[in-house]
Regions:
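N-terminal beta-strand/alpha-helix entry module and adjacent surface
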Residues: 1-88, 93-195, 199-206, 210, ...
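C-terminal functional modules of predominantly eukaryotic multidomain proteins
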Residues: 153-472
Length: 472
């Protein structure tokens, strides 16, 4: 029986729109290469190969495609995919079926081997699993039946462009890293770049003891792992409103936790010689069909933790001019490395991710995603999961405190200014009064006048002092 692959009707429409131009296009099939929902794979997006820098037109045939560019783009796309997704294969749109042309098929197979060779060599960095024999190539020609094969075995695949939407769930746990990782000296330095694979292997070992638990059980003395047949739907609650419409709460009801959680280190923690300390809370969001087994979700989450940790550290190294670090370094994966931003892929509703550097914003995300994946994002499609509410609240409190301080300072300055103005005019009035008294008053009455004046001046001064005390 032929393997069954699911795609959406919108994907076929996309292929047809490319084919209608009568030109050659090549790209990547992104999705789930393995499922527990009765399918051998699910395609969730088709990302075309972008134009080369300074290039004005796309390649005219598979023979004109730069294989190195294909490999680099595949690695870049894999970095943007959460742990439940991978690069499943390639699609080719051309006036003729490339799988039926011996020469073109040979070139295509060579490109696939180069991609898989890099994936195999960097399987730990890319967090890739799966059987290479299942790598797909989809050939589409306008007016002809779509052909999809496992390129290595030449086995045809039954691909269905479904019109009925698939129900997806977004699982959003957070995984805390706070650990000293051993490093090997390379030359005279402990180089993170050269020890990255070793660090990730240690992290993989830690994740072997990680498991899913429900949020309501968090902190219990004994927490059982999920059962083999438990489904992801168990993590979501459903209620009906007054109109009878069923509403599903996507509130995260699980956590990924290790059996030996470490206490948070102090800011001045000392890292032993030959080690690097990684700390931070990694935000994970994976999209899975609603009937996916939780045992599979665990595997996807472990993969996502490794993939995002590797991506962050690699990007961190790339933006550092000098990759030589002291032995006491502590890397905060939340503040020292780029932010991870998730975005929704329409119309399926699944989520992919991207990494942005300090100073970049929504426009940077939209521009990068459009360039690499040919996805037009709406503002509501971008999900800033790595802006913790606690930090937002702290920032808000800080801003409010600063505003109040400025307000109080301004009111205090205003009070002192008013006091000085009153004193100035009181002094003038006193001088005028003294002049009038000495010129117009009889000396016999002068003592009485001065006494009344002193009493009035004292009353005014007491009122000004009282007003100053009442000012916040």
């Amino acid at each position: 029986m032929a393997p069954k692959i699911r795609a959406e009707k919108v994907h076929k429409d996309y292929l047809e729109s490319l084919a209608a131009e009568g030109k050659f296009r090549v790209g990547y099939l992104l999705g789930m290469a393995e499922t527990s929902v009765g399918l051998d794979g699910i395609i969730v997006h088709m990302a075309p190969l972008p134009l080369k820098r300074r290039a004005k037109t796309h390649p005219e045939s598979i023979a004109d495609v730069d294989s190195e560019e294909m490999v680099l783009q595949a690695i870049t796309l894999n970095r943007m995919l959460p742990g439940s997704f991978t690069v499943m294969g390639l699609f080719v749109v051309s006036p003729e079926n490339v799988l039926e042309n011996g020469g073109h098929r040979k070139i295509l197979l060579q490109i696939v081997k180069q991609i898989q060779g890099q994936f195999r060599e960097n399987s730990l960095l890319l967090a890739i699993e799966g059987d290479e024999k299942n790598f797909l190539v989809l050939s589409y020609t306008s007016g002809k039946a779509c052909v999809c094969q496992q390129i290595h075995t030449k086995k045809n695949v039954d691909i269905e462009f479904a019109t009925e939407a698939l129900t997806w769930r977004a699982v959003e746990p957070k995984f805390c890293i706070d650990h000293n990782f051993e490093m090997e000296k390379i030359g005279d330095f402990y180089n993170i770049d050269g020890n990255l694979r070793k660090i990730l292997k240690d992290l993989v070992q830690q994740l072997e003891d990680a498991y899913i638990l429900r949020a309501t059980e968090y902190g219990a003395d004994t927490i059982a792992k999920v059962q083999e047949d438990d489904l992801v739907d168990m993590l979501f609650s459903s209620d009906s409103d007054e109109s009878g419409t069923e509403e599903t709460s996507d509130k995260m009801l699980l956590l990924l936790r290790t059996q030996n959680d470490l206490a948070r280190c102090a800011a001045d923690a000392q890292v032993p010689d030959g080690k690097i300390h990684l700390t931070g809370k990694l935000c994970c969001t994976i999209s899975v069909p609603s009937k996916t087994k939780l045992s599979d979700v665990e595997r996807y989450l472990r993969r996502d933790v490794i993939r995002t940790a590797a991506a962050r550290i690699q990007l961190y190294i790339e933006m550092m001019a000098d990759c030589k670090y002291k032995m006491s370094d502590i890397i905060d994966l939340n503040s020292d490395t780029p932010l991870r931003v998730f975005f929704t892929v329409q119309p399926t509703g699944v989520r992919f991710s991207d990494y942005i550097f300090e100073g970049e914003d929504d426009d940077s995300v939209r521009e990068n995603v459009k360039k690499l994946m040919d996805i037009d994002l709406e503002p509501t499609d971008i999900i800033w999961v790595e802006t913790p509410e606690e930090e937002q609240q702290d920032d808000s409190i800080s801003r409010n405190s600063e505003d109040l301080s400025r307000q109080y300072a301004e009111e205090e300055r205003r009070a002192y200014r008013n006091m000085y103005i009153v004193c100035f005019f009181s002094t003038i009035m006193l001088a005028i009064s003294m002049y009038i008294m000495f010129v117009w008053y009889d000396p016999a009455d002068l003592d009485e006048v001065l006494a009344r004046h002193d009493e009035e001046l004292g009353r005014q001064w007491r009122e000004m002092h009282k007003n100053q005390e009442d000012t916040p």
